[in-house]
Amino acid sequence: MQIVDFLIALLPALFWGSVVIINVFVGGGPYNQIRGTTLGTLFIGFSLLATGHAAFDNLTVIIVGLVSGALWAFGQGNQLKSVHLIGVSKTMPISTGMQLVGTTLFSAIFLGEWSTIVQVVMGLIAMILLVVGISLTSLKAKSEGKSDNPEFKKAMGILLLSTIGYVGYVVLGDIFGVSGTDALFFQSIGMAIGGLILSMNHNTSIKSTALNLIPGVIWGIGNLFMFYSQPKVGVATSFSLSQLLVIVSTLGGIFILGEKKDRRQMIGIWSGIIVIVIASIILGNLK
């Protein structure tokens, strides 16, 4: 593995971790954000079409691409709703952990990816670590005491819905044997359609939607780097490195967006991120 390939393999985490930061930074609320972001992915989709990287000769690829893209839009839209309620630095570690749990369990149970005792044991250890990591990143501020936070409870329900969308997006290609590179153009179409459906009954502005095109383009570029790096450094390494997005987004929420955390929460966030990253490395090496 060359150092350049390794550095390129880090770029998906940087790009994907920046998406929600930019969404919040440019503003517009979750419906402008999801509409703009999903339309932004079209720029990457049409660039693939223009360069001959989209084929229309396989109906399965087209349908899987459209449906999985719409599922991603559903997941992303609900993630943005959670961000609106509890912030980036609390949403992203929880959302990342939930996605890892969901995709791993689905792949293990329905796709038979855990075929040996070692894989089962290591997979269960990773699951436990993910739960611990999510719990650590969700610590309340000392001043909050033991009082219930209705916004946090609402956000957790929204993130469960978000996870369903994200898991569907990830596993659908595996179920039907469709590669991400083949489906990417059609996924961008599905994402745009999904984003429009999610936002159609809500007030949106052209300016805010236009500004939120930027994170959509950035997400798409991150995807291209992911597909480039996988054959260079391996699926396990590229997957594990991509999960570092949780560090980018969480710290961006705190230091760029100015989300306030006390010392107890900062310790919990750092500890939780480390545990989640360790779990993702274990899961990556089970692939």
From Swiss-Prot:
Pfam families: Sugar_transport (PF06800). It is found in: Cell membrane. InterPro entries: Sugar_transport (IPR010651). Its main location: membrane. The keyword ATP-binding does not apply. One of its GO terms (cellular component) is plasma membrane. GO terms for molecular function: carbohydrate transmembrane transporter activity. The chain crosses the membrane at residues 7-29, 34-56, 58-75, 114-136, 156-178, 183-202, 209-228, 233-255, 267-286. It is a multi-pass membrane protein. Keywords: Cell membrane, Membrane, Sugar transport, Transmembrane, Transmembrane helix, Transport. Belongs to the GRP transporter (TC 2.A.7.5) family. Involved in the uptake of glucose. This is Probable glucose uptake protein GlcU.
